[in-house]
Amino acid sequence: MAQAPKKATAKKTAAKTLNFHQQLVTNQWLLNFFNPNTLTGLKERLEHAKFEGIDEDGQTKFFHELCNSLFNKHLVDENTLRRYDLNIVKHWQQITERRNYHEGITLHLKYFQYLSLLVAEIYLDWYFAKTEDMLLGLNQQLALFNQEQSLDQQFELYSQDDLNKVAYWSATGRGK
């Protein structure tokens, strides 16, 4: 990950207070894969129950909605997104198979569960298959972040060794 903030050589300036989400450079980089590139915007588009479930073609309904302009096709093409989605479906079905059978229901992914799994797919794919592109993208995002910071709040660029360290946090917002 980005290294500790650099020491300021000049007199400290009043640092602008950032909220937790503004400081998550990796999160900001991953949000660039989506249109809109905010969690609030994605929630507004995907939270509806009509997008839950799997279509006849084996893809999630979220996948079809993402293909309708919610995904940045300059970063990931539709076939790659399709592969991510099919992997999510495969794992979700394995995870829920016994519970679905015993309870006589079919559990469907909620939008926040789906997005969590999708960003994990993206991160892992880029980490293993597109390492240099990932490093470049993260450092571009970090440069944008650093432009808004005082010198003592800036972070050093990522190195390839930093990419295998990632914190994963997912919350439903329901206080559980």
Language-model features: locations:
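Charged, amphipathic alpha-helical stretches
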Residues: 2-78
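Conserved pre-motif I regulatory segment
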Residues: 67-170
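Conserved glycine(s) of the Walker
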Residues: 175-176
